[in-house]
Amino acid sequence: QSHVHVSFEMPEYTADTVWLWTLRLLEAMRVAGIEKTCKFYQASTSELFWWLEYNRPIAWYNEESPMHPRSPYWCAKLYAMWITRNYKESYDMFACNGILFNHESPTRWETFVTRKITMAVAKINLWLQEKLYLWNLDAKRDWGHAKDYVEAMWLMLQQDKAEDFCISTWVTNTVRNFVDWSFEEVWIEIAWKWKWEDEKWYDKKTWKCLVEVDSRYFRPAEVDFLLWDSSKARKELWWIPKYTVRDMCKEMVASDIEKFRKQEILKNHWYEILEQYEL
């Protein structure tokens, strides 16, 4: 379970699937006697950090910055990260953490904001949905393509010594930007009216309302903006992202349009369609 909003509703299940299973895997390697021959990678999260006075960096957050998780999911990931470090130091294991910024692709779970946006835009384009509902349109994220991030994970496991690395693109964009780009892929230009909880977005040609702010998607503790320094990965792993966020957005919208077109054909022939949701 890796969804932040869901973790507030299911904190115990989140802890069990995130930090307890990390511990179980590490302990299984130790008990089986393969800790010297197997390499262990733990996918950590950039949102272990929160922009507070005591841990605010001079420029960017990095691998050594103080952590302040703000959700049950992030708390679970903090434990997973530190138990990985503990097993590395205690048992001389090759165990490393990748502190990753948001990485997206057409196979992203449907409950995450980027996929929710591209799915809604695809459905609106195909006349299968009326509106897209969101909350914090001004939240900023450093979105990268999953292909680039998996390459970074692989590179981390090719090193002689296990080390933790921050992985980011150094480019931040707002949810608002991502909505704009997604609609541009289906030739819809949108304009917004009002602000905050009353904000609505309209198709400039038809003035039909396509996007609304909805308080149901409010998070009790939101991370609005983070800056990450991935220079260590670029220097030691020679890792540089190849895909831009616009490339990724274009790919995701095109993939969802194709997916829903195929689903409509199947539905018209009485086939049941299974949706993809993460618990």
Question: Model-found features: residue ranges?
Answer:
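N-terminal Rossmann-like NAD(P)+-binding domain of SDR-like oxidoreductases, especially those catalyzing
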Residues: 1-103, 147, 153, 157, ...
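Short histidine/acidic/glycine/proline-rich micro-motifs that form metal-
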Residues: 13, 102-105, 139-140, 217
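Basic side chains
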Residues: 30, 39, 70, 77, ...
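A short beta-to-alpha transition loop/helix N-cap that caps and shapes the active-site region
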Residues: 50-52, 106-108, 174-176
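C-terminal substrate-binding subdomain of Rossmann-fold SDR/epimerase-dehydratase oxidoreductases
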Residues: 110-279
